[in-house]
UniProtKB/Swiss-Prot annotation:
Belongs to the mandelate racemase/muconate lactonizing enzyme family. GalD subfamily. The keyword Cytoplasm does not apply. This is D-galactonate dehydratase family member RspA. GO terms for molecular function: magnesium ion binding; mannonate dehydratase activity. It comes from Escherichia albertii (strain TW07627). SUPFAM superfamilies: Enolase C-terminal domain-like (SSF51604), Enolase N-terminal domain-like (SSF54826). The record marks 316 as: Important for activity and substrate specificity.
Amino acid sequence: MKIVRAEVFVTCPGRNFVTLKITTEDGITGLGDATLNGRELSVASYLQDHLCPQLIGRDAHRIEDIWQFFYKGAYWRRGPVTMSAISAVDMALWDIKAKVANMPLYQLLGGASREGVMVYCHTTGHSIEEALDDYARHQELGFKAIRVQCGIPGMKTTYGMSKGKGLAYEPATKGQWPEEQLWSTEKYLDFMPKLFDAVRNKFGFDEHLLHDMHHRLTPIEAARFGKSIEDYRMFWMEDPTPAENQECFRLIRQHTVTPIAVGEVFNSIWDCKQLIEEQLIDYIRTTLTHAGGITGMRRIADFASLYQVRTGSHGPSDLSPVCMAAALHFDLWVPNFGVQEYMGYSEQMLEVFPHNWTFDNGYMHPGDKPGLGIEFDEKLAAKYPYEPAYLPVARLEDGTLWNW
């Protein structure tokens, strides 16, 4: 089953998405997501200039061989651009293989391990009162796992905050220059336990409570934070410190039993090997779009299962609905599943990407349509051209550049 065409589309129906479409000689198509927030054109170029020409004439069934060819054959292995491109190819080929088999992808992977995929939502507020209102709204929607972020008194900007009340959170700023935000660790450490206390006092412990620290703390600060919030029984604290120094997580582990989730910026099993092997984390947050597609994520999840580490894949709406569809199939199958991030998509985005998944009372299901169960409206996508946008950068109050 030869590949005859491989096309790359960059569209911005509210956010920039990079979509790969592979077509076989039989007319069967597969979709893959290659979106890399703020660096979309780099991945699109890598695909268009290097991978797509080398896909033509290959057997679409040989997914593993193609994965290895693009990973080892590039010589310059790993990295977010290379791996996002490989991920899109892999995703599209699995879409094709499942369509040929006339079954949804999760069945091809080995069948469902659960009835539905528990997803967690994002709640925010510029004050504790606003955050509690947003929490209540998502609780009414049926979410069983809820991430909560909140504005911090004395800080003009805080990670996870929308530009205005009632608006969806959008971190990237359109234009040619990233927004600069200020950060104060001490103000954060002093305030955030008050938010969790307010949530638990008002809503109790029925929902799983999550929080994203977004790489902002040093290891000892993260240990202090984790210890200070143990009474609130967090589902996890996410990205407490930059993970390049993986040994530092041992220090955090020594001081707190608050579960740790890490990995949204990882793009291969080698990025998380030590963290998993030494059981320094509880959830691995690698995503299909950045960590090698279905093929790459299977390796990571299988390895993690040996050490009782569960998946908690990154999945905000700066990854396209194609990734979300693929992730739900993967999540329904993978034995050591934990939770799936789900921000939701605008109506405009979903018109470009007609989908087959469903949400019911805190759980999602990918549907039983053959393949990924998602489509791509090329004509509509063409009406939304690429718009430059960049993720923010953070500075301490004295002007020092910090981790965003």
